[in-house]
Amino acid sequence: SGVWKHHKVVPETPAGFTMRGTVPTDENGVDVMMEIWEKGSSEPPHSHPGDDMTVVIEGKMSVQFFKKDGEKLVEDGKPLILNKGDAGYIEGGRIHDAKYLEDCKLVYVHDKQFGFDAAAVSA
């Protein structure tokens, strides 16, 4: 399908990641991205300013949630495993990582303008 073409590499993002997004961003709307992740790629613990929803079109991924315990992060429950056809929801500000267990195609919807905050999770 043509919808999965024209993905681009975005500077300062994890290896194995390409995306296609909506432009321009409506500050009161949603950002929608079509993401492709290679098997074995991952995202470090981070959070987003708004709620997000990921729909797995192809592949399998794992999301681990974390909470702060003083100066360090500790796992918050078991990893959430998302397979083809599954959708996952993450509240804004919730710390999580992501691991791509298979090649993945995702539709990612973020409330308001997308943001990635790794600084908020570190001391």
For each predicted feature, which ranges?
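Short acidic-glycine-tyrosine-enriched beta hairpin
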Residues: 68-92
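Short beta-strand His + acidic residue motifs that chelate non-heme Fe in jelly-roll/DSBH
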Residues: 43-45, 63-64, 90, 95-101, ...
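Double-stranded beta-helix
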Residues: 4-7, 27-30, 95-123
